[in-house]
Structure formats: structure tokens, C-alpha cells
Amino acid sequence: MDLRILVILVYLLFTLAFGIGFRKRAKESKVEFFLAGRNLTKLLLFFTMAATNFSAFTIFGFSGAGYRIGYSFYPVMGFGTGFMALSFHIIGGKILKLSRDRDYITPSDFIFDRYQSLFLKKLFSLVMIVFTLPYISIQAIASGKSLESLIGLPYLGGALLITGFVVTYVALGGLRSIVWTDFMQGLMMVLFTLCAFLIIASRSGGFAATHQGVFNAHPDLLSRPGMGGAMPYGVWFGYLFLWFFADPMFPQLFQRFMVAKDEETLNTTIVFYPIITSFLFFLTVSIGVMGRGAFPDLSREATDTIFPMLLGQYTSVFLGTVLITGSIAALMSTMDSQLLTLTSMITSDFFTIRRNEVLKEKITIIVLGTLGFLIAIRPPQTILEFISATTFNGLAVLAPAVIGGLYWKSANRYGAVTSILVGESMVIAYYLQLIHTKGILPIVPIIAATTAAFVLVSLFTKSDKENRHIVFSIHRRALLWIPVFTVLFVLGNDFWNWGRRPLLLGGLPLWVWYYFGLGILLSLAFKLFLQRKHV
């Protein structure tokens, strides 16, 4: 057997062992199968939140964007996703408390509890399911491309292999098997990506020298707004805006809010999130930038395979295969959570399953995995464009109904339904290119219209059926922190530094170093904010 295939199979069998190990425990109850008993500790929650969110997009999409756009893509991801962790407190902390008190299992359980509308609950779940399916296919697409590029496995064979193993261990072990594989895969993703980064930097001629060469040939890759002006102000701001509203609406992340042992456990994840995003996202974007030196003329479609191409160029067959398992870990750790969460929503929100009847749940996991694979048969041109046009915008539309439901007593079912219908109609219109907004991402007008519809319809309609007893008030001390986080957000949009020829320090533009520091500052701000909250 080819040594490269053997390495991949050993890794996959190792992940399968977790499913087998937790098989008996997963049969105890739905809470155990879907939520791991609601008692995840700090370390496990941090790794499962990070690994679940950092998908194939993080490895292949970011490196591809680094190749095409340059370092201009790094801050909108590193700082933008780190700043997004504030929503883990705004939304996640409240969902954690309510889920324990009121026995939520799926994201739409909160929607039904708050708005007392079965139609709205099903609509909310349907939107999550429809817009997450393409994201599942992204993991299959990336696995097929990476295995094809590195070890020559046919694209569909690689996609089917990874999808099949993920479906198997999820069906066997439930969330507890996922959490422990997330811990292992999260470590692999970070350590192996770091090793790949160091090897590529060293063998391409040295980090600083390689960047100087890239800067001489393509200065826009180290400048803003990036290669070909890809990241103008409106797009830059739009991405930061998008992550804040879209990421907490990922059903697999939303459900993770319910599994923390306590609020302090969730707070630990919030504090360290900007650190891990600033570090890991830099590595993957930087690998793409350095790839310009080794492969200067890739087609747009081929840019998403720059990571395995560089491993093939600069490492041995065995080492390259070992390191690529880190990227496979990234996509598996997202796919497994998506499959389990969507299964919980389909079986709980649309069908009634008798106690301890797990067969339908496992069949649902298999069906979802199959659908994701079928979408991957005809992959889109680039990972970034595909999910930006579908998943992120479609899920972000749900945020006003959730945030308004948590904090605004006047919010009602009519406003929530209208906001979702208006928002998704705009998502479809943008996707079909019936609407165009030059120089700004669609998410900005979409969220503006969605929020306006939610507020106006709630104000001008009456409904006495809502459960307003679970609405939270905003503490005065929390309001004092609004200016602090506003300033940090403005600092993350440092447009006053744009358009200048960058000064390089250690091969990197000074503004990239600025964002390293800003990520650390954001983490410290989260720490102080969450500490003072408990005083």
C-alpha cells in the first residue's frame, strides 16, 4: 500500500476509535448524544468551539485568498473573527443560561420558547439547515482537492473517504466523540499548520527574503486594499460586520453555547479567541502569500490548492502527508459538528422520535452526509466566493430575531418572521444578481433592511402570546463598555493607514504587526470586561 494512503488511513481509524469508545454513552439520552451532558470543561469547550469554526475554509480558503489578495485578507479574518467572539457573550451567555433552565437542545428551541410560534420555529430551523448544507459540502470539496493534490487520490474518492469516516464516528459516538476528536484535531490543525509554515518559509529561501521577493514582484500583496483592489473600505468593513452576525448563527456554534459547564467556561473561550484567530489565520494567509514565489501564475480555481502544492514542493512524501492531516483535521472538525447539529434540528424540530430511538438520528446523519457529498460533485470555482454568497449571508439574517428576542420585550413573532423573509429574499436577489451594491458587501444592506423590518413590524403589530419573561435587561456596567469596544472596532478599520507604501519589518508590513498587537489588546479587553461583570 502507498505510504501516503497508509498515513491517512491510520489517522482516520484513530478518529473512528473515539466514536466506538463513546458509543455506549451516546445511547443514554438525547442530551448526552447531542449535547454531551451539558458539562464541557474550559479546555474542551475552547478547542471544540475553535475547531468547529475553523474549517477547510481556514486552511484552503485563507491560503487561497492570501495567494490572490495578499495580507489585506488577514486582518478582516484574524481581528474580525476575534472581535466576533464578543457575540459569544451577547448571545451565547444568555442562551447557555436559558438552555439549562428551560431544557433547550436545538437553536430553534429558544425561538419557539420566546416567540411561541411553531411556524417561526420551523422557518428558523429550515433556514439554518438550507444554508448549512453548502458548508458541509465545502469540507468534502476541500478533502477531495487536498488528497488529489498531495497523494493522487481521485477527487471524488477523497471526498467520499473523508465524508464516510466522519459520518461513521458521529453516528456512533455523538457529541462526546466529536468534542474529543475536536481536541485532538484542533491541536493537530495548529501544530501541523505551524510546522508547514516554518518548513515552507525556510525552504523557499527564508521568510524575510521570500516576502521581499514577493513585494518586489507584487507589492499589492503586502499593501491595502490588496491585489487588484480586492478589499476596498466597504468590503473590509463588510467582512467584519458579516462575521459578527453570521458566525454565532452557525447552528453548530449556536448549539455549542448550550454545552458549556458554566458561564465562566464560556468566558474563557471568549478571552482566548482573538489570540488563536490572530495566530492561526496569519499562518494560513502567509502560506498563500509565500506561494506566489513558488507558483506565480496559478489559475483562480487552483489557488485553493496552494497549501498542498507547497507541501508537495518543499517536503518529502511522508512528511507532506503527515502535515496535510492537519488540514484534514480542520475540515473534519467542522463537518462532524454540522452533521450532528442539523440532525438534532431535523429529528427534534420536524419529527417526533420516541425516547432512546437513535436509528432515525443515525439515518439522518447518513442522509445529510450524502447530500453534502452530492453538492461537492460539481464544486464551485472558489471556496471563498461560494460560501460568502450562500451560507454566511443566509445565516446572518437570523441574528436580529435572536438578539431582539433576548433583549427587547417589544419584539414579536410578526417582526421576526418578516425580518427573516425580507432578509432571505435579499440574499436570493443578490445571489441572482438582481441587486447590486458597488464597493460594499451585500451583508451591510441586508442586515440594515432585516433589522428595520424586525423593529418596525414589531412596533406596529400586537401579539400577547410571546414569552417576555425570559427577556434579559442590559446591566448599566455593560453599557459603559460600549465605547471601549467601539474604539477597538474603529481601530480594526484603520483606514487612515491605507494607500501608503508599506514599510517592512522582518519581511512583514508594519500594519500586519499592528494587527498582532490589536488582537492581544482585544483579548485583554475581553478579560477585563468579563471579570468586572462578575464583581
Residue ranges and their predicted role:
Residues 511-513:
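Hydrophobic alpha-helical transmembrane segments
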